[in-house]
Amino acid sequence: MKHKKSIILIIISISLLGLMLIFIGPEKIVNDIRKADPLYLSLAVAVHMLTLYLWMVRWRIAVVAAKIKTKNQPLFRILVLGLATNNITPAKSGGEALRAYLLSKYSKTPFESSFATVLIDKGLDTFPLILLSIISLFHMILVFRFSLWLVIGLLITLFAVVFSFFIILYVSVKPELGKKVKRGIMRIARIFYKHKSKKLSKLESRISDAIVKYQDAVRLMIKNKNVIYVALPLSFVIWFLEIIRIWAVFWAFGVYISPIIIAEVMIVATLVSMVPIFPGGLGAIEGLMILFYSMAGVPLPLSAAITIVERLISFWLTIFLGVATLPYFGSDMVGKVFK
């Protein structure tokens, strides 16, 4: 049922995007795409691949800090499949759990420890997101003169993301809060396991063990110097490379645009992709990118051409790479991804 919903949402998203492109003018868009410089497009693809590799390096720092043993190659495949799964699920919600599951399976470690590494890896993105959001929102107010309500909406979304991460992190390192979480889960469990004291006792023991393993893994990573002094700066490098990739696509079309505007579009696209409507923000993100670039002075058909090519690299290439890893994980994994 879930995979049918995702397929329907993808079809709706692509249909809306198609209508948008028809309105702009397909012939003009195709003509602009034909003029793109292959050298700069190759550079954009190379930067994207480098970004994925550095993402794996950053995650590996958390994995090593949690004392989980695995090699680079399977870790890269797991990362790419997780990112591809995010691109086909609303609010990018499926990839993290899949990454934790696969890491747990192939490293033969508890799922709780694997999930903790994914939490830290995602959390490291919060810091460049905050910095770029502050710069971008001020620039949006001054240059684009967006309505106050739109800016407030973006600020609320950003605050919700940051607040949620730090709350989860705080709960993750405080043993007493872990006990409260366990009590809350047990209260719900007692509704479904009335008059089954043995099952409740086993469940309580498993939950306690899971929370302890998870919190131990988080504390190990936070105390590790490499997480702070290597992985955190690497997060800023990864975001910088994202901007360079988009910039390279603009160069391919002979267009110069301020990197601040690119950063703004990235931030808005990131926040929009977190809204649980369309898979990976498909359709909505493309529309916003075309709108922003045209407002920055890029002709509408050219904005559409640049957006299509950029999304082919950042969105669809990632999905293709993720699908290409499925044979490595076995036929059973195909069902798990598309459930």
From Swiss-Prot:
Q: Topology versus the membrane, per the UniProt entry?
A: Multi-pass membrane protein
Known Pfam families for this protein?
A: LPG_synthase_TM
Residue ranges annotated as transmembrane are: 6-26, 37-57, 124-144, 148-168, 227-247, 248-268, 287-309, 312-332
Q: Domain of life of the organism in this record? A: Archaea
InterPro entries linked to this entry: L-PG_synthase/AglD
Indicate where this protein resides in the cell.
Cell membrane
| Disulfide-bonded cysteines | none
- Principal place of residence: membrane
State the family named in the UniProt similarity comment for this chain. Belongs to the UPF0104 family.
Q: What is this protein called?
A: UPF0104 membrane protein Mfer_0536
